[in-house]
Curated annotation (Swiss-Prot):
UniProt name for this protein: Inter-alpha-trypsin inhibitor heavy chain H2
The family this protein is said to belong to: Belongs to the ITIH family.
UniProt organism field: Bos taurus
Post-translational modification: Phosphorylated by FAM20C in the extracellular medium.
Subcellular location: Secreted
Disulfide bonds: none
Coiled coil ranges: none
Highest taxon above the source species: Eukaryota
Gene Ontology molecular functions: serine-type endopeptidase inhibitor activity
Role this protein plays: May act as a carrier of hyaluronan in serum or as a binding protein between hyaluronan and other matrix protein, including those on cell surfaces in tissues to regulate the localization, synthesis and degradation of hyaluronan which are essential to cells undergoing biological processes.
Chief location of this protein within or outside the cell: secreted
Keywords, in A-Z order: Protease inhibitor, Secreted, Serine protease inhibitor
Lineage of source species: Eukaryota, Metazoa, Chordata, Craniata, Vertebrata
Amino acid sequence: LHYQEVKWRKLGSYEHRLHLKPGRLAKHELEVFNGYFVHFPAPENMIPIG
């Protein structure tokens, strides 16, 4: 699963959107800010969605 995550503030509240691309493999890392990455392991009990 490959995804993009967008969060922005509008009129005092935050909106959060995920753009998903099923079928694409993604590395176990997430770019947080200005090239900094957070690494995370995939859960072993993860079940694919239909």
